């Protein structure tokens, strides 16, 4: 049994080391819809990959990275709030992607179910290497840019006074998030990746009193959620990714039990 679920479990653990820190910054900056924007726009990236017969991973990575740059640029120049920009781009790119895929479905066989929900149990050794490399890149970037991104998150004006390049710090955070999502979508799915970015850090905040502890607890809770969700999926023969999200949500609710009573 363990041999069947081990690759998927290991993939989830490796992803946790990237989603934990990134999700924490996303919550601190109150841009939780950013993950939805990138994941929804990946549908358009999928349409492009089908049109040009390119591996969807590369088109999604390029497209989401490009979109992250555009979002940072628009946030810098426009007076509209970031949440408004994210909402407009999210639904526009999702709509365009769905229209493109529907037009191409007459000449291509397109199965969106795996893409929307993912399948963590179909991980190969090559996939594990990609996930490990991607998580390592994310952690390395965050390690070297920790002070500037944290200062930007705490107080943007203070960060500017301290000499932090605001545009570059924002771009770093959004690009690393784009890398993480483009890697995770294949295994977790478009509809659920944001949940894995948001729920564990939200739970971790209950037990933490510092940024470092929040990230540490977030990674730990992600690992617990992945482990519990995979076993739940295996024993009850239900989809893996929704099981992980549901398990993570239960952990969040149990952590808030004192407030709920």
Swiss-Prot record:
Gene3D superfamilies cross-referenced by the UniProt entry: ABC transporter involved in vitamin B12 uptake, BtuC
Annotated Pfam families: ABC-3
GO biological process, one term: response to zinc ion
Protein topology in the membrane: Multi-pass membrane protein
Subcellular location: Cell membrane
Primary localization class, coarse: membrane
Transmembrane parts of this sequence: 8-28, 54-74, 84-104, 129-149, 179-199, 215-235, 238-254
Protein's recorded name: High-affinity zinc uptake system membrane protein ZnuB
Function field: Involved in the high-affinity zinc uptake transport system.
Cell membrane among keywords: yes
One cellular component term from this protein's GO annotations in UniProt: ATP-binding cassette (ABC) transporter complex
Species of origin: Buchnera aphidicola subsp. Schizaphis graminum (strain Sg)
InterPro entries in UniProt: ABC_BtuC-like, ABC_TroCD
Keyword Membrane recorded: yes
Record-linked NCBIfam families: PRK09543.1
Family: Belongs to the ABC-3 integral membrane protein family.
Swiss-Prot/TrEMBL keywords: Cell membrane, Ion transport, Membrane, Transmembrane, Transmembrane helix, Transport, Zinc, Zinc transport
